[in-house]
Amino acid sequence: MSNAKITELGTQSIRSLLLKYAMPGIIAMTAMSLYNMVDSIFIGHGVGALALSGLTVAKPFMDICAAFGTLVGVGASSLVAIKLGEKDYRSANDILANVILLNVLLGAIIMVVGLYWLDPILYAFGASNETIVYAHEYMEIILWGNIITHIYYGLNSMLRSIGHPRISMYATILAVSLNVVLDPIFIFVMDMGVRGAALATIISQIVSVIVEMIIFLNPKEVIHFHRGIWRLRRDITMRALGIGLAPFLMHMAACFVVIVLNNQLKRYGGDMAIATFGMTNRFMFFFAMIVMGIQQGMQPIVGYNYGANLKDRMIRAFKLSVYCATCVMGILWLFGVVWPEGFIRLFTHDEVLIAQSIAPARIMLCVMFAIGFPMITGNFYTSIGMASKAIFLSLTRQVLYLIPLILCLPLLFELIGCAPIWGVWWALPISDSLSVITAAIVINRDMKKFKN
């Protein structure tokens, strides 16, 4: 990418920049979320409700693996955007090499540890004797391909930060499209069940990594692979991991919450309650991924203008991103309140499961119209290197609010004569509401400082 293209982040209108940088991310994230939904749809209809529950149990383990990729990828890409704003291209190239080296190292460690303790981990995450076989079969394949997964996400983040959001989008769409083609072949034609779904995921990521590598092997790029950069640098590693710590902790906290939630659901509602959460969460994830696409578009704009000391442009990019995210999550809220049965039937034809899922889905989605704001706010702080505040916002919702509510509300509901499972469901929207209030207080104070 040329210097002129990098500089556009500080000169072009915020609206056009956000459209240019966010739209590829939105398309890519929408495609990725569709892949996650299609994966669950094939498993739900092709294998059964218990397999769907097993996949829900495995999801926090997958998210933990992804969290370590986020620790490197998001942190390094934010640092690259800042370095580009400072015109420090040599450091930006060193960061690129460190992304590869760190992802290989962390990916290998997680693979070995995960495979060795796979069943105990899955039982701790909420698996039952009926669902453990499905969760094990799926995660075993995913873990063998964990290094590829880490590199895939790391390079995808770097592509967006160096001004190639479209190529990042194409790489993601390629992975998604290939996965959607391979899923029915492996699950139905070859009768591989959940193993087939996992194998399709890894194969599609391998192909996308090859595409990403081709871009970074081009010497005409300002940021590219070349000799002299292939060494771990302590300063880059610590800085990148420090910036990436916020989204990492957010992902880890979310994983821990799902683990606690799965166990509470299994305790009060059984495997079918876990399946209910899994279906609703996958549908909610579709819209959340669109917001993540907006975050991806905002990140290089905010990071560059912060590094270039163009605070007014930075603030305008943040506000426009919040507006867009709120509109997206508002659509989810309308869908969840008006017709939850519609999306539930996408995942299963089990009439008992469908009937028991409608009311919990409405509860979980009842305040979704407001949740885009804290999502954008946390990413904003990550983009400008203020990791501590991003960490605070993510941990207040996930740890300070949600976990105590998940544990205490079922007991309270039981005391007043209601089924305790409803306390688990209501913990989610209450925590979301508190997180919106907290984010508003924090960002309001800092916006006054930035304007001054």
Regions found by a protein language model. Name each.
Residues 1-22, 80-147, 191-245, 302-367, ...:
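Short alpha-helical transmembrane segments in multi-pass integral membrane proteins
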Residues 34-53, 122-129, 185-192, 255-282, ...:
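Helix-terminus/linker motif at the lipid-water interface of multi-pass membrane proteins
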Residues 49-60, 139, 198, 271-286, ...:
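Small-residue hotspots at the loop-to-helix junctions and early N-terminal turns
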Residues 52-112, 149-168, 276-340, 371-390:
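Small-residue-rich hydrophobic transmembrane alpha-helices
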Residues 64-67, 179-184, 209-213, 285-289, ...:
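Hydrophobic transmembrane alpha-helices of multi-pass small-molecule transporters
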Residues 142-160, 168-176, 197-210, 291-295, ...:
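Short runs within selected transmembrane alpha-helices of multi-pass transporters and secretion channels
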